[in-house]
A protein has these predicted regions:
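Membrane-integrated ABC transporters
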Residues: 1-210, 224, 228-233, 252, ...
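ABC-type nucleotide-binding domain
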Residues: 117, 123, 503-779
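Transmembrane helix-loop-helix hairpins at lipid-water interfaces of multipass membrane proteins
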Residues: 194-248, 255, 327-332, 443-447
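Hydrophobic alpha-helical transmembrane bundles that constitute the permease/transmembrane domains
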Residues: 198, 202-213, 243-250, 301-304, ...
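Juxtamembrane loop-to-helix connectors within ABC transporter transmembrane domains
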Residues: 215-216, 256, 274-321, 378, ...
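Transmembrane helices of ABC transporter permease
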Residues: 236-245, 249, 311-361, 431-445, ...
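Loop segments that connect adjacent transmembrane helices in multi-pass transporters
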Residues: 273-290, 361-409, 481, 499-501, ...
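Cytosolic ends of transmembrane helices, especially the final helix of ABC transmembrane type-1 domains
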Residues: 365, 369, 381-388, 412, ...
Length: 779
């Protein structure tokens, strides 16, 4: 029986790859990218709830069960998905295709007892017990393999997801855009260049075939009759032909280079242009290395289509033309050449699957290694402050060694294929020589004819030899096409066919009405949240970490859509507005400030590219950033290092605040925007906010409650719900959750369970850590 195997693209793709295998078993083809979305896969992977949800959506009846060893041998539907723990201690999923099955309960128990007795006997005799029970699994990170039940149970957690297709299950192939068609669309505007490349190739082919007649004329016409005058003419003609061939070859190479560049620009920029249009969910659930390696995929595809594809087309044409000539010259020798070609084609098919597996492993490991390097360099300060350089280097070394091992296996496969190909060509070439020379000796063929045949036969056999040598590159391009197509087919964050209203300014109340939301298939981040931000009022969100404050800001910025409920601005549903116009109308300062390798002036005016230097300076003064900028060597023209390295956390936050103030929006969202500032600077900035921006709407997410005590409304959140609301004074009078947080920060909260001893004063920064709702969701 043939089993359907799908390799994962990334370490978090195992669940999606397993479900893709099950779907393929039932004749349904669906991409890993689509399944990731259906499951709610994120950087932590996928949980069982997400897998069940996706399977049911596809039309499967599902049951998550826990089985012991005896029950695993009972009869149940396969393929199914099993949870295992890898040797590195990570949760992982594999597909179970087939296993030892004993239907009768009594026989199964007797089987287990017999097996236990055999184990004891082997242990007593010092022998190794050989388990005859087997499991055939598809491990998306490794391979399809048959292992013993003992080996399987070393990693099996006992959890299975059983799946049976229902009447709602639909077979068929998921509709995908064709990467080949996309590429041909890129080539079409360059059709003139492509035509020149083909024309030059045809001319070179004709010249090559004509040149093969040189030896025949020399051997059969000139040497036997001593035609010295004709010799000079023939040499002169063929010299001109060869020089012409060299010049045309050079022109062809220039055309191909220029064609490659002309295709490269729209292909590469088109990929990143599409990536920038993707929703935040896409970036939040993927590692940076996984996204950047698709750039390499695009480069691989371009290389194949602009050079290899053209060569293959011309090689095929050349093989057909020379094949006809060779057949007419000598049918016997031609049959040997045909046999050589057929063996070479057979060799390509034999090595197709090994090359496919090794290419998939190479690409997956490349993404993992890139992500590891990016994470290590991005977190270098944390690595150094904890003196973890050696440990981080060990982790990087492990991934690099894995890459080298895969590369070594790839080289071994290529070497074996190359050796077999060389043997086929050499042995059959010798056979051709023997038969040809015998025909010359027997007078059945002239020496010149034989030499011409030998020269021409290379034009016939070389295309297939080239195909064999390029098989790795071609199959790598096929995998790259599949991976890149999945990204290019990923839906943009906004429907480009729909007409949206453009938001000029936020000039009304903002209302959240019964809004619920969750990240993927995780626990709800928000549950039935309702509140209003009156126009021109200041509203604060407070809570302990992971309660949903930042999620509210992300929904308001249209990074995500609510699972249920509505968000409206001035009575109009937020969904009616285009994403870009909503974000332009809001001045947002996130928790994590991102600065770019540009001047300070350019970094601040990102929010308003047309802003003058005077306007940027005015915004910097509001953010209390002007003074520290003046002390820099080139002041506002100072070029920042990558990610603003060299600036303190407080300086980065002040630049981010300057961006927001430069935008001069009607709604400001400050998400822990002053957490790195000292109390004096923080108070200065909030005094400016309450005075100079008194008429602007504002949503402030804060842990330091002293900064939001003057807000018009304070919302207290707990586990995704609003548990209290009111002004600072009203909430203190209630002596509820807000009172506890305030008292804790003021150092006067008493632990009622332990007595009346006052708690030691603790700064707000020590009470709670910076919130990241995406990271605080539990399984």
């Amino acid at each position: 029986m043939r089993y359907t195997y799908v390799r994962q693209h990334d370490t978090t793709d195992c669940a999606a790859a397993c479900l893709a295998m099950v779907c393929l078993h039932y004749k349904k083809e669906i991409t890993i990218t689509r399944l990731r979305d259906m499951m709610g896969t994120d950087l932590k992977g996928t949980n069982l709830t997400g897998m069940e949800k996706a399977a049911q959506e596809l039309g499967f009846s599902t049951a998550a069960v826990r089985v012991d060893r005896e029950n695993f041998l009972s009869e149940f539907t396969t393929p199914c998905i099993a949870q295992v723990i890898t040797d590195e201690g990570l949760a992982h999923f594999v597909t179970v295709f087939k296993k030892t099955t004993i239907k009768d309960d009594g026989e199964r128990r007797r089987h287990m007892l017999r097996q236990e007795e055999e184990r004891k006997k082997c242990a007593d005799e010092g022998k190794k017990f050989k388990c005859r029970d087997y499991v055939i699994i598809g491990d998306p990170a490794k391979e399809l393999k048959k292992i013993s039940l003992d080996e399987f149970y070393k990693n099996f957690t006992g959890v299975l997801l059983l799946m049976t297709p229902t009447s709602e299950f639909k077979t068929g192939k998921q509709k995908q855009g064709s990467m080949v068609k996309r590429f041909l669309d890129l080539l079409w505007p360059q059709k003139k260049l492509f035509f020149y490349a083909i024309l030059s190739s045809v001319i070179l082919t004709i010249i090559g075939i004509a040149s093969s007649m040189y030896n025949k004329i020399l051997m059969d016409e000139i040497l036997p009759y001593g035609l010295k005058s004709l010799l000079v003419a023939v040499i002169l003609v063929f010299s001109i032909v060869n020089v012409t061939s060299a010049l045309i070859s050079m022109v062809r190479q220039w055309v191909l280079i220029y064609l490659s560049i002309k295709v490269d620009i729209p292909l590469m920029l088109g990929y990143f242009g599409h990536v920038f249009k993707l929703p935040m969910k896409f970036f939040a659930t993927r590692k940076t290395g996984e996204i950047t390696t698709r750039y390499s995929d695009a480069s691989t595809i371009k290389s194949v289509f602009t050079s290899i594809a053209l060569s293959v087309v011309m090689d095929v044409v050349m093989a057909c033309v020379t094949g006809v000539i060779l057949f007419r010259m000598n049918a016997t020798l031609f049959s040997i050449s045909i046999f050589t070609t057929l063996l070479s084609i057979l060799l390509v098919f034999i090595f197709k699957q090994p090359f496919k597996r090794i290419n998939e492993e190479t690409m997956q490991q490349s993404a993992i290694l890139n992500s590891q390097m990016i994470e290590s360099l991005r977190g270098i300060e944390t690595v150094k402050c904890n003196a973890e350089e050696d440990r981080e280097l060990e982790a990087l070394e492990r991934e690099y060694i894995k890459s080298l091992k895969i590369s070594l296996r790839s080289s071994k496969i290529s070497t074996v294929q190359s050796l077999i190909s060389t043997l086929i060509t050499t042995i059959l070439g010798m056979v051709t020589s023997y038969v040809g020379i015998m025909q010359v000796l027997n007078g059945e063929m002239t020496l010149g004819g034989y030499m011409a045949f030998s020269t021409l036969s290379s034009y016939f056999t070389n295309p297939v030899s080239e195909l064999v040598s390029l098989q790795m590159s071609i199959q790598q391009a096929q995998i790259s096409i599949k991976r890149l197509t999945e990204i290019m087919d990923y839906e943009s964050e906004q429907d480009e066919t729909r007409e949206y209203t453009e938001m000029e300014k936020i000039d009304g109340d903002i209302e959240f009405k019964d809004v619920s939301f969750r990240y993927g298939s995780r626990s709800p981040a928000l549950s039935h949240v309702s509140f209003t931000i009156p126009y021109g009022k200041k509203v604060a969100l407070v809570s302990s970490s992971g309660s949903g404050k930042s999620t509210i800001t992300k929904l308001l910025l249209k990074y995500y859509e609510p699972e249920s409920g509505t968000i409206s601005v001035g009575g109009v549903d937020l969904d009616e507005y285009s994403n870009a116009s909503v974000r332009r109308a809001i001045a947002y300062v996130p928790q994590n400030v991102e600065l770019f390798s540009k001047t300070i002036y350019d970094n601040i005016r990102i929010s308003r590219p047309e802003a003058s230097l005077d306007e940027v300076k005015a915004a910097a003064k509001k953010a209390d950033a002007h003074e520290f900028i003046r002390k820099l060597p080139l002041q506002y023209n100072t070029y920042l290092e990558e990610a603003g390295n060299g600036l303190s956390g407080g300086e980065k936050q002040r630049l981010a605040l300057a961006r927001a103030f430069l935008k001069d929006a009607n709604l400001y969202i400050l998400d822990e925007s002053t957490s790195s500032l000292d109390f004096g600077t923080e108070n200065t900035i909030f005094d400016m906010i309450y005075n100079q921006l008194a008429d602007r709407s504002m949503l402030i997410v804060a842990h330091r409650l002293s900064t939001i005590r003057d807000c018009d409304l304070i919302l207290v959140m707990d586990h995704g719900e609003i548990v209290e609301r009111g002004t600072h004074e009203e909430l203190l009078e209630k002596q509820g959750k807000y009172y506890e947080l305030w008292s804790l920060q003021q150092g006067i909260f008493r632990d009622k369970k332990r007595g009346s001893k006052p708690a030691a004063p603790v700064s707000a920064a020590k009470v709670v850590e910076d919130e990241d709702d995406g990271e605080s969701i539990t399984y």
